[in-house]
Regions:
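Generic beta-sheet signal
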Residues: 4, 45, 136-146
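Phosphate-handling substructures
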Residues: 62-120
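Conserved small/polar residues in nucleotide/adenosyl-binding loops
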Residues: 202-204
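Active-site-proximal alpha-helix that buttresses catalytic centers in soluble enzyme cores
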Residues: 2-66
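A polyampholytic, Gly/Pro-enriched intrinsically disordered region
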Residues: 87-100, 183-198
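Short beta-strand scaffold positions
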Residues: 49-50, 119, 143-144
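Domain-level recognition of soluble alpha/beta enzyme cores
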Residues: 157-185
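Glycine-rich phosphate-binding loop signature in dinucleotide/nucleotide-binding domains
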Residues: 41-43, 128-138
Length: 204
């Protein structure tokens, strides 16, 4: 069995302002950095990250001294016209209202479709799993984005829930396991051990 920790990056200024932060490569905010320094994730054998700064910085704080493997396909969604804006700033935008009315199923204007985003993330996740199997890694961490985690869990979790119900807070995520032999034979499933409640990992 391979154990994976799917961890959402720490908080950024854009997160604090409820902005759609996808391709915008902003760093962690001070609050996010301070919060992560209080957390205590287990040691792992490999760390895989999105190429965006907020994920790389989070990995460096949570797993100091561990080399990180950049997986381009694990990056967050390209929100196109909505990028780096919040719902208040998008009020009155007809494209935004159409997207809301579609329950988030329409492609982001000038950005990615849900299907394209998910397909890209799953390719990246398959690369991670293949790397773990090839290198005999028994426990690894993925420091990625909220949307990326939701795509992976919606597709592979042994508990059936829709995309938005897999949402996690900054610094939180999921502990999952997979059987590498079943995975190699096409039976791709993640056993959900627990949701990572970020507050339970804080040093007192």
């Amino acid at each position: 069995m391979i154990k994976l920790w799917l961890i959402r990056h720490g908080k950024t200024e854009g997160n604090k302002l409820s902005r759609y932060i996808g391709t915008t490569d902003e760093p962690l905010c001070q609050e996010g950095t301070e919060f992560l320094h209080k957390m205590d994730y287990p040691k792992v054998q490999a760390v895989y990250v999105s190429p965006l700064k907020r994920c790389v910085q989070t990995a460096e704080i949570l797993f100091p001294g561990e080399p990180v493997h950049i997986i381009e396909e694990l990056a967050e969604c390209d929100f196109g016209e909505f990028e780096n804006k919040n719902y208040k700033e998008l009020e009155g935008n007809p494209h935004y209202q159409e997207w809301i009315d579609s329950n988030g199923t329409l492609p982001f204007p000038g950005g990615e479709s849900r299907e394209g985003f998910k397909s890209r993330n799953l390719r990246g996740f398959d690369r991670v799993v293949s790397g773990c199997i090839r290198s005999h890694v028994a426990e690894a961490a993925l420091v990625i984005h909220g949307g990326t985690i939701m795509n992976i869990m919606e597709e592979y979790a042994d508990i059936q829930k829709p995309f938005y119900e897999w949402h996690v807070r900054n610094g939180g995520g999921y502990e999952v396991e997979l059987d590498e032999n079943l995975w190699k034979n096409g039976r791709k499933q993640l056993r959900v051990n627990s949701a990572i409640m970020e507050l339970s990992l804080i040093h007192i």
